[in-house]
Amino acid sequence: MKAIVYRDFGSPDVLRVEDVEKPTPADDEVLVAVHAAGVNMFDWYMVRGKPFVFRLVLGPGRQKPLGVDLSGVVEAVGRNVTRFKPGDEVFGTGRDKMRAKRGSFAEYVSAPEKILAVKPRNVSFEQAAGVPVAGLTALQGLRNHGLLRSGQKVLVNGASGGVGTFAVQIAKAFGANVTGVCSTRNVEMVKGIGADHVIDYTRESFTSGAVRYDVILDIVGNQSWAECRRMLTDSGKYIAAGGPPRRALPLMLREPFTRGKLVTFVARANLADLNVMRQLIEDGRVTPVVDRTYPLEETAEAVRYVAAGHTRGKVVIKVR
């Protein structure tokens, strides 16, 4: 089968399409014929090998797969799999933790049953492929860590990107009053997906306003913690869900001393939350926004586009 692999760390130019062995599902795994695969900033960090821990885990020189999000059709199942059968349409993640043998930028992936769910019936494979990492980051950030409740004020910094477009819609579905931060060209799009207010960051900073927020979900990480803290209500929470890797460690070290106002986290794929996203999508309360699609052969260009940090929704690799 064809798959995207890389051996050295660097720019997207290190990515290659190669013929690799088609996987065989283990007892608890599902073999999926991949139709589409979502591209995430995480993929770019993997290719760069930054933060440095990625280089230690993945190792230099050896063949490495790429890609996390996927949607497709079940081709075969392991003997212990009970929820799926061949022909079922699924979405989820191809990686359980950082197992190097798996990557969703491929024609087939053998993935654990526990991180796959039935694909939402009312969206395309391309739309479904963009949901897992970005959708669960938005969901878990707002619900689990922001403890979002109906009627609260939420600010999403990076509202027009992959995570942000989900966050705006999820916050609205939860009954929040939502402010989105984006550039001029994306203002109308962010309004269109449900934001009550939009701040154009090319004209003003969200940290200079008078409004205080119950939850700030920050996907961009372009403002200091001190500046963001001033924008919170007394019980408000600042959720760091993205930004440059170099920013993560200082925030993590500061987190224990903020009395719960600062939270850093990485989303965890799980069946329950994939099903929450599926229900939100099938109910029409969340619609995955796809910016661009690329064929498998142009994965390097897709990663390059995501790395630039100006996507409008999700970028997806169309495999079939």
Model-predicted segments: where are they?
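Glycine-rich phosphate-binding loop and adjacent beta-alpha segment
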Residues: C182, I219-V286, V319-R320
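NAD(P)H dinucleotide-binding glycine-rich loop of Rossmann-like/cofactor-binding domains
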Residues: Y45, P60, V68, R83, ...
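N-terminal Rossmann-like NAD(P) cofactor-binding module of classical short-chain dehydrogenase/reductase
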Residues: F91, I199, I216-L217, I239
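C-terminal hydrophobic helical "lid"/dimerization subdomain
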Residues: N270-R320
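Glycine-rich beta-strand-centered segment in the early N-terminal region that forms part
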Residues: E21-V39, P51-K97
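Mid-domain Rossmann-like dinucleotide-binding core that forms the NAD(H)/NADP(H) cofactor-binding site
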Residues: A128-D200
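Short glycine-centered segments of the SAM/dcSAM-binding site in methyltransferase folds
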Residues: E89, K153, N177, G236-K237, ...
